[in-house]
From Swiss-Prot:
PROSITE patterns linked: SCORP_SHORT_TOXIN
Function, in words: Selectively and irreversibly binds (K(d)=2.9 pM) and blocks Kv1.3/KCNA3 potassium channels of human T-lymphocytes. Weakly blocks Kv1.2/KCNA2 (9%).
MF term (GO), any: potassium channel regulator activity
Family per similarity comment: Belongs to the short scorpion toxin superfamily. Potassium channel inhibitor family. Alpha-KTx 23 subfamily.
InterPro entries noted in UniProt: Scorpion_toxin-like_sf, Scorpion_toxinS_K_inh
Alphabetized UniProt keyword annotations: Disulfide bond, Ion channel impairing toxin, Neurotoxin, Potassium channel impairing toxin, Secreted, Toxin, Voltage-gated potassium channel impairing toxin
Stored Gene3D superfamilies: Knottin, scorpion toxin-like
Highest taxon of the lineage: Eukaryota
Protein name as it appears in the record: Potassium channel toxin alpha-KTx 23.2
Disulfide bonds: 6-26, 12-31, 16-33
GO cellular component, one term: extracellular region
Entry remark concerning the domains of this protein: Has the structural arrangement of an alpha-helix connected to antiparallel beta-sheets by disulfide bonds (CS-alpha/beta).
Amino acid sequence: AAAISCVGSKECLPKCKAQGCKSGKCMNKKCKCYC
């Protein structure tokens, strides 16, 4: 999966859910998705 840049964790959640993942958070300016 391509790295998704982010500023805050709340912007990762919809992007991760769009990839079929349950949740996600922002770490080191990249989204980390938990599938």
